[in-house]
Amino acid sequence: MSSDLAAELGFDPALKKKKKTKKVIPDDFDAAVNGKENGSGDDLFAGLKKKKKKSKSVSADAEAEKEPTDDIAEALGELSLKKKKKKTKDSSVDAFEKELAKAGLDNVDAESKEGTPSANSSIQQEVGLPYSELLSRFFNILRTNNPELAGDRSGPKFRIPPPVCLRDGKKTIFSNIQDIAEKLHRSPEHLIQYLFAELGTSGSVDGQKRLVIKGKFQSKQMENVLRRYILEYVTCKTCKSINTELKREQSNRLFFMVCKSCGSTRSVSSIKTGFQATVGKRRRM
């Protein structure tokens, strides 16, 4: 049936269709070839970004920022910090030696080695005295004016006789308390009152001016009490002198210690009685 229809229509199925060929104009062909080449070139550099040209506004901002910094630098002027150059030790030593030579200290050192001049006024006028000479002059003046502060043992020494304690049963006899009070330039009553307060006991003075104390005490204990008494009521705290006097004012009944060597005065605390235990039989209820 199909073959009959094809024969009637005049169509041969064995034959193929002929494709129509386009007529190419040479000018159009060249343009097309050039377009393909340009397109391929653009495709190669499509991944890369083109550099943008900096706008003039950016440069203007940079100039505006530079202007205030330049103004600040001009305002500071000479205050700009500069790095200090480190001077070498050799140059500093040479400069120091030159200054010594100008001052004439070399001659002074030579004179001090040979012998010290006798007059103090001439020494004071010179420049650059050595330390050893100044120190010796200071101690010489100190020994002449105040030998006690110089630590010189050749001056007047303060010595008191050691306390002599005797035993009499349960009592202790302080036999030389009168001599110690005279050495300290204090009244025996004041010294006895201090002893009773420190030892916490009581006693009395017999006909031979000996102190009879209730209780058993050794001479070492008496020495410690006497040391504390000397520091508190005899020695001057300003010049460490023992040439003092204890006075009592009638208006306020306070004790004042007056130093006869330096003239200083200070108040002294009054003697307070120590603790005394009451020993005795209790009453029966």
UniProtKB/Swiss-Prot annotation:
GO terms for molecular function: mRNA binding; translation initiation factor activity; translation initiation factor binding; zinc ion binding. SMART domains: eIF2B_5. GO terms for cellular component: cytosol; eukaryotic 43S preinitiation complex; eukaryotic translation initiation factor 2 complex; multi-eIF complex; ribosome. It holds the Pfam family eIF-5_eIF-2B. Residues 30-69 are annotated as: Disordered. The modification Phosphothreonine is found at residues 69, 116. One of its GO terms (biological process) is formation of translation preinitiation complex. Belongs to the eIF-2-beta/eIF-5 family. This is Eukaryotic translation initiation factor 2 subunit beta. The lineage of its organism: Eukaryota, Fungi, Dikarya, Ascomycota, Saccharomycotina.
